[in-house]
């Protein structure tokens, strides 16, 4: 409906004393969200208008005027508009149909799937058994959930050195200490987090989580959760969002421990090549003679200095918006050359970690049974983080800039906080209805949901997944992150 003058006045107030432009078309260049992508900002803004009883508004977006069409922007989330009109939200693109892939080897390289020769041979075998070529969705999905990132094939594999088979895998060596001396460790190396025995503590929570209610204090037997994981590839390619989603991912892992638990505080560690700090005139800001031992490389995406600044900003930004402080961390810069061999953190290391707690009642996952419902909580699906599992499993720079940028997730701490509020409410209840819970991250729905029903199997109706971008293909729906 056409807004009334009162509604226009309320909107002008809401937008910070803005004025209504009485025009059908705005001239000039603008940077704004892609038309097929409803932003988290829009979701929150529309909800505010609904709470103000301003009905009929389905989308609100921000567009920023820029000087030219060459202005910097994030092509994954934004696009350049030469003028803005009434059709700014109109999408005329249809989803790509499911395709049969005739050349596995070529498709593997084009899509950045990082499939090995053995894996391609296995897929050829499946083609013969099925009597047809595999689809792009099947191959893409297999590459994500079978990637090194998701399956730890190197760490869990058997090593043969100088013709001799080693007694243990790297993973078993890591687990050995805990197996022989568990002490207070209750769960490790088999869930999203590790849990150790905690003290009896007071829980201060609403008596009824479904409505406004008084708070009450209860004694609960607690467990302490610990988690750390690297987010190296995304931070090398796009440091702000790479580090932000690193922090966000390890927070989700603590939320998804057992059948739900609470994050408390985080840490972030950064390792890069020498930053070679410069002042505004391009001269060395600090005397660092040792940084000159190796020539400066032509960096693929960002310099070490840019990575340290942007990654630190990204990790802190997510923690601040979510409500988890980063309370400690470390920085290491290193380069070395010896006997013609060069060593440096050209592919950076970003380690996100944290501590949390939960109820001892909830530290073990249950086994889903027939009839249990699969529930997906959080934001809608968009063309973001495609192929992150497979692309992050190989050397950065192996694939094109487009593939690697597409594989980096984008942060949405506000939506994650909403999902956390639900998890917290369920865990604080006297009865937690959750049987098993996993976080949705690398390799998308296919990896998350297959882990969820790993022991029993399950049926997922793809049409019921929360799809925000109606132009997503089947491949993109099952694998977006």
Predicted stretch roles:
Residues 435-438:
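Short catalytic-loop micro-motif centered on adjacent basic/acidic residues
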Residues 1-396, 401-415, 419, 423-431, ...:
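Core nucleic-acid recognition elements
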Residues 453-475:
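Anionic-ligand anchoring segments at beta-strand to alpha-helix junctions in alpha/beta enzyme folds, i.e.
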């Amino acid at each position: 409906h056409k807004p009334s003058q009162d509604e226009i006045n309320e909107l002008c107030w809401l937008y910070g004393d803005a004025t209504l432009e009485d025009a059908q078309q705005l001239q000039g260049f603008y940077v704004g969200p892609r038309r097929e992508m409803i932003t988290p900002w829009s979701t929150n803004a529309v909800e505010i208008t609904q709470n103000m009883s301003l009905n009929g508004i389905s989308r609100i977006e921000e567009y920023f005027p820029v000087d030219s069409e060459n202005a910097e922007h994030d092509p994954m989330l934004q696009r350049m508009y030469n003028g803005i009109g009434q059709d700014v939200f109109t999408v005329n693109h249809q989803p790509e149909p499911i395709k049969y892939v005739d050349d596995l080897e070529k498709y593997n390289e084009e899509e950045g799937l990082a499939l090995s020769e053995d894996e391609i041979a296995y897929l050829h075998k499946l083609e013969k058994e099925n009597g047809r070529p595999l689809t792009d969705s099947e191959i893409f999905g297999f590459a994500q959930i079978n990637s090194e990132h998701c399956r730890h094939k190197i760490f869990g594999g058997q090593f043969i050195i100088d013709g001799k088979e080693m007694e243990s895998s790297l993973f078993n060596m890591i687990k050995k200490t805990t197996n022989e001396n568990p002490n207070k460790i209750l769960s490790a190396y088999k869930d999203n987090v590790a849990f150790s025995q905690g003290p009896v503590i007071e829980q201060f929570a609403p008596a009824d989580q479904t409505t406004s209610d008084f708070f009450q204090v209860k004694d609960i037997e607690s467990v302490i959760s610990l988690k750390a994981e690297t987010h190296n590839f995304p931070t090398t390619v796009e440091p702000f969002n790479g580090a932000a989603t690193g922090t966000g991912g390890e927070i989700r892992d603590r939320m998804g421990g057992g059948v739900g638990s609470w994050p408390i505080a985080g840490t972030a560690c950064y390792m890069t090549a020498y930053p070679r700090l410069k002042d505004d005139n391009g001269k060395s800001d600090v005397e660092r003679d040792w940084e000159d031992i190796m020539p400066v490389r032509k960096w693929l995406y960002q310099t070490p200095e840019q990575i340290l600044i942007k990654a630190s900003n990204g990790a802190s930004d997510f923690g601040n918006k979510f409500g988890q402080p980063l309370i400690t961390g470390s920085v290491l810069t290193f380069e070395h050359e010896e006997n013609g061999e060069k060593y440096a953190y050209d592919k950076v290391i970003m380690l996100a970690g944290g501590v949390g707690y939960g109820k001892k009642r909830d530290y073990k996952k249950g086994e889903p049974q027939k009839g249990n419902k699969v529930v997906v909580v959080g934001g809608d699906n968009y063309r973001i983080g495609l192929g992150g599992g497979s692309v992050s499993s190989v050397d950065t720079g192996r694939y094109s800039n487009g593939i690697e940028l597409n594989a980096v997730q984008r942060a949405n701490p506000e939506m994650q906080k909403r999902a956390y509020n639900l998890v917290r409410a369920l865990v604080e209840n006297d009865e937690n209805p959750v049987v098993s819970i996993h976080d949705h991250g690398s390799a998308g729905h296919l990896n998350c949901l297959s882990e969820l029903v790993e022991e029993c199997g399950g049926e997922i109706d793809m049409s019921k997944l929360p799809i925000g971008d109606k132009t997503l293909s089947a491949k993109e729906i099952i694998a977006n992150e």
